[in-house]
Structure formats: structure tokens, C-alpha cells
From Swiss-Prot:
<dbReference type="InterPro" id="IPR036823">
    <property type="entry name" value="Ribosomal_uS7_dom_sf"/>
</dbReference>
<dbReference type="GO" id="GO:0003735">
    <property type="term" value="F:structural constituent of ribosome"/>
</dbReference>
<dbReference type="GO" id="GO:0015935">
    <property type="term" value="C:small ribosomal subunit"/>
</dbReference>
<keyword id="KW-0699">rRNA-binding</keyword>
<dbReference type="GO" id="GO:0006412">
    <property type="term" value="P:translation"/>
</dbReference>
<comment type="function">
    <text>One of the primary rRNA binding proteins, it binds directly to 16S rRNA where it nucleates assembly of the head domain of the 30S subunit. Is located at the subunit interface close to the decoding center, probably blocks exit of the E-site tRNA.</text>
</comment>
<keyword id="KW-0820">tRNA-binding</keyword>
<keyword id="KW-0694">RNA-binding</keyword>
<dbReference type="InterPro" id="IPR000235">
    <property type="entry name" value="Ribosomal_uS7"/>
</dbReference>
<dbReference type="InterPro" id="IPR023798">
    <property type="entry name" value="Ribosomal_uS7_dom"/>
</dbReference>
<keyword id="KW-0689">Ribosomal protein</keyword>
<dbReference type="InterPro" id="IPR020606">
    <property type="entry name" value="Ribosomal_uS7_CS"/>
</dbReference>
<comment type="similarity">
    <text>Belongs to the universal ribosomal protein uS7 family.</text>
</comment>
<dbReference type="GO" id="GO:0000049">
    <property type="term" value="F:tRNA binding"/>
</dbReference>
<dbReference type="InterPro" id="IPR005717">
    <property type="entry name" value="Ribosomal_uS7_bac/org-type"/>
</dbReference>
<keyword id="KW-0687">Ribonucleoprotein</keyword>
<dbReference type="Pfam" id="PF00177">
    <property type="entry name" value="Ribosomal_S7"/>
</dbReference>
Amino acid sequence: MPRRRVIGQRKILPDPKFKSELLAKFVNIVMVDGKKSTAEKIVYGALDLMAEKSGKDHLAVFEEALENVRPAVEVKSRRVGGSTYQVPVEVRPVRRNALAMRWMVEAARKRGEKSMAQRLANEMLDASENKGTAVKKREDVHRMADANKAFAHYRW
């Protein structure tokens, strides 16, 4: 960690099609080996499929899916006197978004559909309806935090 000054977070350019910073971040998370145009095709294809299936606006379903996957609390390991405790801590807003997007992409990659766009679209549709692997992951994280509530006083 720097001692002199806190370095601000780099500003991300909004995506060209929907002018959304969240979507631009999502494209970056989907991207593999620096192939951004391929990642954009996948994400935009998934959004089109999603809008077709749900009949709602592209971004509205995406936002709703993200909202349902965002974790409020997580556990961090804290070593106290020879034993390690899982201490529940609140998640900062930026990390909340990052975790939600990462979990959604990971869940989509594990699905069985043919193309990545289809997998992503179906995972986002499931997440917008509060079901699916990504939502289950969030529930597991919340359950862990709830189970370790007794160690909340070890927070730093």
C-alpha cells in the first residue's frame, strides 16, 4: 500500500452501444486473452437473446440480474491468537459489482448450452428471476456470514 497518497481508481469508458459503464466492465470480465471484440459480440448477443426471451429492455434485465447477485456481506479470514476466524464484513459498492459480475460469468461458463452468448443470456435471465447458480453463490456467501456473526467483533 502506498504511504504518500491514495491513488484514485481508473475511470472506465462506457460501452459504445448502450453507453453504460457497468456493461463495459462486464465486457472486460467476459474478455479472455485480450479479445475484446469477441467479448463484446458475446455480451451483446446475450443481451439480444435475453431481451427476445423476456420481452423487456436489455439493460433493465441486466441491472435486475446484477442486483439479485450482488452480495451485501462476505467473510474474511482473521487470525487471532493461533486460530483463524471467518469474520463477516460489509462489501464495498465497487467490489459488490465486481463480485456479482464475476460470479455471473463463472456460472455461465459452467452451463451446458451451445454458445457462450446463450449461456450468459440464460444465466442473466435466471438471476433476474432470483434463481440460478450465481444467485445460489450469493446465498452461500450470505449464509457463511450469518453463521459467523459471533465473530463480527473481530472486525478491523
